[in-house]
């Protein structure tokens, strides 16, 4: 049976950005809007390993987790009809970054450090990198270090003070513009 082809601006979209910017929630809705599958990289790793991300960090360390991320990206970059939501640090790996930038549009989601902290604190204990005395300062430091890498994305969208639907609408609009600019 032939696959029904519907017009869409891309068949593989990556969402990147710092933790707490809304990649997972927005990714699910974006996938629905584009009629694509959705994979959250952290959940994918948890399913494959049978271990939660906080437990991977706690028992195996960040380095082991980053290797798992890299391997998962290598595997998923070959898929089609997919919105892939990365973990906050995944795009920092040069090999993963190159593969994803070459595969399809990469969308960087942004939010202020205060918004990120407020969102992250909704699920205390789920953000291993924020288990420090001053999480807001940690967010600012990490965000400052990662921002130049996130800026390599094709598309940039702020999620501060916005509904998921608004953000998805802006992403779809920018994906179409990106596709048109590339002659797709």
Swiss-Prot record:
The keyword Zinc-finger does not apply. Binds 1 Mg(2+) ion per subunit. ATP binds at residues 20-25, 127, 162. Substrate binds at residues 42, 66, 88, 146. The gene is aroK. This is Shikimate kinase. Monomer. Pfam families: SKI. Its cofactor is Mg(2+). It catalyses: shikimate + ATP = 3-phosphoshikimate + ADP + H(+). It comes from Thermus thermophilus (strain ATCC BAA-163 / DSM 7039 / HB27). One of its GO terms (molecular function) is magnesium ion binding.
């Amino acid at each position: 049976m032939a696959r029904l082809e519907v017009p869409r601006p891309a068949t593989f979209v990556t969402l990147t950005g710092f933790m707490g910017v809304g990649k997972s929630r927005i990714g699910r809705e974006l996938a629905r809007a584009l009629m694509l599958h959705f994979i959250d990289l952290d959940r994918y790793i948890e399913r494959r390993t049978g271990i939660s991300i906080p437990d991977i960090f706690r028992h195996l360390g960040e380095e082991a987790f980053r290797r798992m991320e890299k391997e998962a990206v290598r595997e998923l970059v070959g898929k089609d009809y997919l919105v892939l939501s990365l973990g906050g640090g995944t795009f920092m790996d040069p090999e993963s970054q190159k593969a994803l930038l070459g595969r399809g549009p990469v969308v960087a989601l942004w939010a202020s450090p205060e918004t990120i902290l407020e969102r992250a604190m909704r699920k205390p204990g789920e953000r291993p990198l924020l288990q420090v005395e001053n999480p807001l300062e940690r967010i600012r430091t990490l965000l400052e270090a990662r921002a130049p890498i996130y800026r390599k994305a094709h598309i940039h969208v702020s999620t501060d003070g916005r509904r998921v639907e608004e953000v998805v609408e802006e992403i779809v609009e920018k994906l179409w513009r990106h596709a048109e600019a590339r002659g797709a």
